[in-house]
Swiss-Prot record:
Keywords: Cell membrane, Disulfide bond, G-protein coupled receptor, Glycoprotein, Lipoprotein, Membrane, Methylation, Palmitate, Phosphoprotein, Receptor, Transducer, Transmembrane, Transmembrane helix. The modification Omega-N-methylarginine is found at R367. Disulfide bonds join C120-C201. One of its GO terms (cellular component) is plasma membrane. The lineage of its organism: Eukaryota, Metazoa, Chordata, Craniata, Vertebrata. Belongs to the G-protein coupled receptor 1 family. Adrenergic receptor subfamily. ADRA2A sub-subfamily. The modification Phosphoserine is found at S345. It holds the Pfam family 7tm_1. A lipid is attached at C456 (S-palmitoyl cysteine). It is found in: Cell membrane. The record marks D127 as: Implicated in ligand binding. This is Alpha-2A adrenergic receptor.
Amino acid sequence: MFRQEQRWPRQLWPMGSLQPDSGNASWNGTEGPGGGTRATPYSLQVTVTLVCLVGLLILLTVFGNVLVIIAVFTSRALKAPQNLFLVSLASADILVATLVIPFSLANEVMGYWYFGKAWCEIYLALDVLFCTSSIVHLCAISLDRYWSITQAIEYNLKRTPRRIKAIIVTVWVISAVISFPPLISFEKAGGGGQQPAEPRCEINDQKWYVISSSIGSFFAPCLIMILVYVRIYQIAKRRTRVPPSRRGPDAHAAAPPGGAERRPNGLGLERGVGPGGAEAEPLPTQVNGAPGEPAPAGPRDAEALDLEESSSSEHAERPPGARRPERGLRAKSKARASQVKPGDSLPRRAPGAAGSGTSGSGPGEERGGGAKASRWRGRQNREKRFTFVLAVVIGVFVVCWFPFFFTYTLTAVGCSVPRTLFKFFFWFGYCNSSLNPVIYTIFNHDFRRAFKKILCRGDRKRIV
């Protein structure tokens, strides 16, 4: 992402990010643009291998993130405003794959900067901007999830498309503030002295910028993400550990301000419908007589890390007038509850059973302890699954980016980092752009269904 490495002798720098040292480089002569002989750092076989691997990375990144964007705009289940975060994140990753990685690859295999000074400045700015934006997006998504859980009614009524777009604009502004000023306003260090024979493309290498940009682009967002996700996990764990035997009668919470209508969503919670008709997050009901504490029966509490939850429910997908008899719905709900497997979503209850956690509280409720026990086992499985997803999200993010930013900061304070190791970390960070669609969508049923619909249109009736 950033184009600075250890300060080897400047006459040995053929380019800005991956400068070979004088002892280990193997160079092959090639014909340069001006007719002279230029040095290339790799043999033909290694060059072809690198081009194929990075080309595959580019294709996977573009394909996966384009699928995410199409799914959000075409699937009814993904119309929730918070899914705009994923659209913006996917757009940033696509831009990294199309406007940054190809030029980084050319810079690497050619051994010098071929594309001129003007594009060098643009390329450096876009490189830092897009990669920083991708990281800050993940931080914004984690904060959005945290607020939607801790301030369920208030925040979810305010979570409008306009507000989400404003947050997205803020993310891009923060990324630009980190990226652009040093490239435009400050003179690059080491500008004097003998100029190298090969054109280079270098970013600001002043110590203050390396440290501050590393903190702003990675360490601060990463710390926020970890703290927020730990808090989300603690909340979800506390809610899912309330057993059915200790739960009091569920009472319907008072209608939220603003005249929002409430609909049962089949999860033991109720979904608020805002003035614009957009569905908000499930509104909490009372647990053990404590108003405002969300009921622990809903899988959305346990699955707090499913970043973009479904905005539809089973009853909403049926056409009007297609309601089944209550008895049949109740039987189907019980049958599905008894078939919960580890990692599966909990069964959704019939519309008439929403908000009824105990026997005798409503006509559409589920009676008997068997269904409750099944739901409780399902919640335990969801907690395990939640732990796994949490580990994947934080682990992959840190694994991809921490090595690069750590070694990048070490070089600023004068520590020696092997050139090959730094190059590996540099390219490994780019892999996060291709992994984001997997991490943030494959664990969500609505995205899986949308992907199947996009890729297998001939099977549309079965999927929808």
